[in-house]
Amino acid sequence: KHFKTGRPEEDYHAWTARLRREEDRPRVAWNNQWLPPNWGWESEKAAFRFYLGHFDLFGKRQWIDTLIMPKIAESKSYHIDQNGWGMDILHVGKTAGCGGVILYVNGVPYPVRNETGKGNPTFTGRVVEQTNNQLTLEFVAEGVGPENTPCTVRLRPSIGAGDLYSSVEATVDGGAPGDKIELGIGLVRLPDETFFSDRDAGIIGSWGFQDPEIGWIGMGIMFPPERFLRFDNQPEEHRVVLDCKRGEPITYNIRGDWLRGHQFPCCPSAQDWFDILIYTR
């Protein structure tokens, strides 16, 4: 028997390609309404949060492709692993978290964050680009540095479909013309951690433990090695300091990992995490 639909016969390869083509759906998302001044952004595999200069990490179960930002306000507390997809995996405290920046002016550090939400620096945010597969946000910090000659720091985090990391483009403008400026990138210290740095590869990272509710986590920052100046480790955070010129963007990547987010973790070591950072540099 034949089904006479009246349609011309379709080429078999074109037919299978059409059926196998991935559905055109959003694979990145953002939200800034659930808990101002928080901004969240994500792919199906990784999610990040920014508030007043701090960079935070969410851990996702890697065998589940999901976007959490559109309905994050409707979920239970993400500080506990109770929503199925994962949880917030980092206690940032009064630090850069994973990827916050520090502006150095004539050698003096000025963390680009605001612990109280009052005074300087002030922060604004906006969406620069959004498609189903690519997202770029922008956070502008004004009033950074010396009170009489402040700078403006512009951060543009981006993420693409399937990405396990977020790139961040940082640009500094303003200040006194004769001032020497440098840009530091911070990584919060964990109470129990193995820290790793490789100036030639352009990587700092850690594998460690902060909270029994969270378990073991990994963090990494990948920076342009040609910009490297020095490490500036502080009691609460590790820092890498980069050469910075006004108006010239510096792009670095931030990435996190959550041991419980892997279906078959196989007891990875700190070296396994560092190898991943180097391999995916």
What is each of the regions a protein language model found here?
Residues 138-140, 156-158, 169-171, 186, ...:
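Residue-level recognition of well-ordered beta-strand positions that form the cores
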Residues 83-160:
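Extended, loop-rich substrate-binding clefts of extracytoplasmic carbohydrate-active enzymes
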Residues 221-281:
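Beta-strand-rich recognition/accessory modules
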Residues 1-116:
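Solvent-exposed N-terminal domain segments of exported/luminal and surface proteins
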Residues 39-43, 139, 206:
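Short acidic-hydrophobic surface loop/beta-edge motif
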Residues 126-133, 161-163, 173-180, 243-249:
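A short, structured loop/turn motif at beta-sheet edges
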Residues 189-238:
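Accessory, usually C-terminal, subdomains that scaffold auxiliary metal cofactors
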Residues 153, 164-198:
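Acidic (Asp/Glu-rich), glycine- and aromatic
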